[in-house]
A protein has these predicted regions:
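Exposed, low-structure sequence patches enriched in small/polar residues
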Residues: 1-186
């Protein structure tokens, strides 16, 4: 009789429902209620690689007394260094510009081809580098929409990732840039 539990995953996405309450009087004057829902999953697509996504939406049910640090802030980036949390961050979004105390919805998706394309090119196959494509979107009361696409090469020397990102934001503003990331935990 086995004495261990083996979790083999699920074919269904993971859903998290959250609620956050700031109670005034406990050494603070903040008073707000935030309800959130998040869904994420990794979908194995055989030879075509893996598709991963994370979507989150939230609404401040009460925002009676809030300070800027209590707002919902989105993981942005204004440097050439990529955030390791690829499925919860934007590549080109300015810091704090679109932070909100009302409602929001964001979604991130990436497809890792796991060599599906590059393995057909002899020198690239030998280098074991892999291709990745991603998309990111943000909606909230501060703007109509913000979109990003990124195209990258990962597993360079097993730990380095290069991305080229394109962003399209409010008022028809385009942005683009290169990013470098390291997939190693120190």
């Amino acid at each position: 009789m086995p004495y261990r539990k083996v979790i083999s995953g699920s074919k269904y996405p993971r859903i998290n429902i959250g609620y956050k309450k700031a109670i005034p009087g406990l050494n603070t004057k903040a008073d707000y209620d935030l309800a959130t829902i998040q869904m994420d999953d990794n979908i194995q697509m055989g030879l075509f690689g893996t598709f991963s996504y994370r979507a989150m939406a939230g609404y401040f049910l009460n925002n009676k007394t809030m300070y800027f640090m209590d707002y919902k802030h989105f993981n942005g980036n204004q440097t050439v260094l990529a955030n390791q949390s690829y499925l919860s961050s934007f590549k080109l979004l300015p810091y704090y510009t679109y932070s909100t105390k009302n409602w929001f919805a964001e979604a991130h998706g990436e497809h890792h081809f796991n060599g599906f394309i590059f393995n057909k090119i002899p020198l690239l196959k030998k280098a074991r580098i892999q291709e990745v494509v991603g998309g990111h979107v943000l909606f909230n009361d501060k703007m109509d929409q913000y979109y990003e696409l990124n195209f990258g090469i990962e597993k360079i020397l097993q730990i380095i990732r290069f991305d080229y990102a394109l962003g399209y934001g409010p008022y028809g503003k385009f942005n683009h840039g290169f990013l470098i990331g390291i997939d190693a935990e120190f």
